[in-house]
């Protein structure tokens, strides 16, 4: 058999061994390696390579090099080399060469170079001398690594419960009482609903995470495969922590990640074990709310005020712009898109939010039109069914062009929905159901079905002469007896009404409540106009009798608290026109001014000061046209 010493096999083997030895000397090898070396024909020789230094990943404070050998923070080190020496010694190390500050290795003092990656700005640096890798951390990153941050929404809720418990219902009620006058029953319902929403999140989120982990792990895996998966996850997290320079057992972040790995292991019972078990975890379900009441009673204001004091995302959506899928208008998914936007596009945080559906009565179906599709009424209600109950909604991503695939999946199971609407004419439907006398009419009328017929009957009743206080009391009494079948007759489909189990009727505002709205709450109407006049160095005084007269006018208009601002704008139009750039220092409004019997009273400054102001203002006004003419000429 001919010898192969002179053939190319020997040369290839020599090159392979040489490259292996060079790699081992550079530090790629992780321990003792047995390698077979080709020798004489038919024999093998084994050489044992010595242990090569490991490439370690640590997190240590690195110092900036300067010309005089002093670090950036002022602590000098004579043993460390200067920037010029390091650059002259390793000219091909890959430094930028722009003359800026360079990072030194905290182990040997040699200059560190940035690791070349596909990212233009990398935070990893390496030392060519001691083969150490480092992560450059900013001050903000260092602070974040010390403080334990929650790894998921469930841990964030648990941490919030431990550090600061959720506000009790009484505290939420007192906060709403500062901005909204009256409606005590609605405030109590909303306060309790928000508090229970916090508790439901705390109770349900861990169970959902376990179910999601079980789906991802596949329940058909054997215990051996589960153990292998668990070790793989631990290995991944350990390597990740080593790259970041954090020990998996010596740091709070490492402990939390290790705990997260253990939590992701499915621990729920499977198959026959579920049938044999007598104990099961309680899952709290949500109770969506429906607020109904006359216009201007404070439904939207309650939602806006409630959004300020919550630690969960809150979105207010207008149902009047919603249409069925495929038609011009906003899609139903835009409701969740607004919530996701309020959560800064954090999906887990958005899945714990609260959605307020305003003007929900405007999507009531219109009966009698069987040939046409009610795309803005019953079609929207049908699209909201699964949204209210809990489903996966595909929401377009941030800054996406609504192309295929650019969506985010949001689970609405734990999102609380609060709907509100005026439901004009609902009291007449309740009266007909109860066969009671309604505002002087003897026999029940043949009123048509649907929200349009009810609203038309209510509008016809408003145009007639009647006692305002009697109307308010009768409507409030009837709305307290509202039932699901009344809402169905109004135009809401039974499936939609059934998903709003808590129905809260709001009472109309009386004269006393309207007077309180003018003055008492924060951001009241009268203080707003006083602030406007104070910018012109003028005071606004409104007497108590004038406040009562304004409240009576608002009651007659039957527009609720919104009528107050309309009346105030009409009363103060002339004063707001006369006060700027004048000598008026006070405006007085009394009962006769509200009734239209006289003009508002003005209190002016002394005559001498006013004449000087008029003279100065006249010169300025005449001077501007003269200067403009001179410039044009």
Swiss-Prot record:
Biased composition range(s): Low complexity: 84-93
InterPro entries: AAA+_ATPase, ATP-dep_Clp_protease_ClpX, ATPase_AAA_core, Clp_ATPase_C, Clp_protease_ATP-bd_su_ClpX, P-loop_NTPase, Znf_CppX_C4
BP terms from Gene Ontology: ATP metabolic process; proteolysis; proteolysis involved in protein catabolic process
Binding site for Zn(2+): 105, 108, 127, 130
Primary location: mitochondrion
Domain ClpX-type ZB, first and last residues per copy: 93-146
Annotated positions of the Phosphoserine modification: 617
Disulfide bridge partners, by residue number: none
GO molecular function: ATP binding; ATP hydrolysis activity; ATP-dependent protein folding chaperone; peptidase activator activity; protein dimerization activity; unfolded protein binding; zinc ion binding
Protein name: ATP-dependent clpX-like chaperone, mitochondrial
């Amino acid at each position: 058999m001919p010898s192969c010493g002179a053939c190319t096999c020997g040369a290839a083997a020599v090159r392979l061994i040489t490259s292996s030895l060079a790699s081992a000397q550079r530090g790629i090898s992780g321990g003792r390696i047995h390698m077979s070396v080709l020798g004489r024909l038919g024999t093998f020789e084994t050489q044992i390579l010595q242990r090569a230094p490991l490439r370690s990943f640590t997190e240590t404070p690195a110092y900036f090099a300067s010309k005089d050998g002093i670090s950036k923070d002022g602590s000098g080190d004579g043993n460390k080399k200067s920037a010029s020496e390091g650059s002259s010694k390793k000219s091909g190390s890959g430094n930028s060469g722009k003359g800026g500050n360079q990072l030194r290795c905290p182990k040997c003092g040699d200059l560190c170079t940035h690791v070349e990656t596909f990212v233009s700005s990398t935070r990893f640096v390496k030392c060519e001398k001691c083969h150490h890798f480092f992560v450059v951390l900013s001050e903000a990153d260092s602070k974040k690594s010390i403080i334990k941050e929650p790894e998921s929404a469930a841990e964030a809720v648990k941490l919030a419960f431990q550090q600061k418990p959720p506000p009790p219902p009484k505290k939420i009620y007192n906060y709403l009482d500062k901005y909204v006058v009256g409606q005590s029953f609605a405030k109590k319902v909303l306060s309790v609903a928000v508090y229970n929403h916090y508790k439901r999140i705390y109770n349900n989120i861990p169970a959902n995470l376990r179910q999601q982990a079980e789906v991802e792990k596949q329940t058909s895996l054997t215990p051996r495969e589960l153990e292998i998966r668990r070790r793989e996850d631990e290995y991944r997290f350990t390597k990740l922590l080593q790259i970041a320079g954090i020990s998996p057992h010596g740091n709070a972040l490492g402990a939390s990640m290790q705990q997260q790995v253990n939590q992701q292991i499915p621990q729920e019972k499977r198959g026959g074990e579920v049938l044999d078990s007598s104990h099961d975890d309680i899952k709290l379900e949500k109770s969506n709310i429906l607020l109904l009441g006359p216009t201007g009673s404070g439904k939207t204001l309650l939602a806006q005020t409630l959004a300020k004091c919550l630690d969960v995302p809150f979105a207010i959506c207008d149902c009047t712009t919603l249409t069925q899928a495929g038609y011009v208008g906003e899609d139903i998914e835009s409701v969740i898109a607004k919530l996701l936007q309020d959560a800064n596009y954090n999906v887990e945080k958005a899945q714990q939010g609260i959605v307020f559906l305003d003007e929900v009565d405007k999507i009531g179906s219109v009966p009698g039109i069987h040939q046409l599709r009610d795309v803005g009424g019953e079609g929207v209600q049908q699209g909201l069914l699964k949204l209210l109950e809990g489903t996966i909604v595909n929401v377009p991503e941030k800054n996406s062009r609504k192309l295929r695939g650019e969506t985010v999946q949001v689970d609405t199971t734990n999102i609380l929905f609060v709907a509100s609407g005026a439901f004009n004419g609902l009291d007449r439907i309740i009266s007909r159901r109860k066969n009671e006398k309604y505002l002087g009419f003897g026999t029940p009328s043949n009123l048509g079905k649907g929200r349009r017929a009810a609203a038309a009957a209510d509008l016809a009743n408003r145009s007639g002469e009647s006692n305002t206080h009697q109307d308010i009391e009768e409507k409030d009494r009837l709305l307290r007896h509202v039932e699901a079948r009344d809402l169905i007759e109004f135009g809401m489909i039974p499936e939609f009404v059934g998903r709003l189990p808590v129905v809260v009727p709001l009472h109309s505002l009386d004269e006393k409540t309207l007077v309180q709205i003018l003055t008492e709450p924060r951001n009241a109407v009268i203080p707003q106009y006083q602030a406007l006049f104070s910018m012109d160095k003028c005071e606004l005084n409104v007497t108590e009798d004038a406040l009562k007269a304004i409240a009576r006018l608002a009651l007659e208009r039957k527009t609720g608290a919104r009528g107050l601002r309309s009346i105030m704008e009409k009363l103060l139009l002339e004063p707001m026109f006369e006060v700027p750039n004048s000598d008026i220092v006070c405006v007085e409004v009394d009962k006769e001014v509200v009734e239209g019997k006289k003009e508002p009273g003005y209190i002016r400054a002394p005559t001498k000061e006013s004449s000087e102001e008029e003279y100065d203002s006249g010169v300025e006004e005449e001077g501007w046209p003269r200067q403009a003419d001179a410039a044009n000429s």
